[in-house]
Amino acid sequence: MSESHEQLRQRLLQSQQTVLQAVAHMDAERIRVLVNPGWTAQDLLAHLAAAELGHCAVVHRLLVGEDTAIPGFNLDTFNNAEVQARRHLGLDELVAEYNANRAATLDLLASIGDDDWDKAGPHPGGFDTTVESVFRVITIHEKRHLRELQVAH
């Protein structure tokens, strides 16, 4: 791993620990507190778990040279559908999914070669990105949502 890989790995691990700490002591009442319009703390954890898969999919497409732009794609609609699909899951199940998805992200990061780092394309969030940047976006995205999770404390 290059230093950049290791720095990103550490950022991802630290961000994961911060998310897990934010939900670790939430009881059934707190996990159902609205933290933004329409989403509870539990929904937000579901969103973070689902977003991880989406970010990995973007990286995979960039690596093989596939177009990452999806005609008619609406990020808000996608995010809401992913959260809705996980509403039946309990907190422990969501934490397990989040952890499994983060492990897959770390495995993907470890597989990135130096020639792949700068492969670029559009991100579903509406901006241009590179393989490297997608990993950075994951931690930035979580940091933003961590502020919302803190509302439930």
Language-model segments: which ranges?
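Short acidic/polar alpha-helix capping motifs at helix-coil junctions
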Residues: 6-9, 21-25, 46, 69-71, ...
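Amphipathic, non-membrane alpha-helical segments in soluble helical-bundle scaffolds
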Residues: 2-12, 38-45, 91-95, 131-135
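A short secondary-structure junction motif
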Residues: 19-22, 26, 112-115, 152
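Acidic/histidine-rich alpha-helical segments that form the ligand environment
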Residues: 11, 15, 79-118, 136
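Non-transmembrane alpha-helical segments in soluble domains
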Residues: 9, 20, 42-45, 56, ...
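Short, contiguous alpha-helical
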Residues: 31-77, 106, 117-153
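Alpha-helical bundle segments that constitute or directly flank the non-heme di-iron/ferroxidase center
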Residues: 2-28, 50-61, 136-140
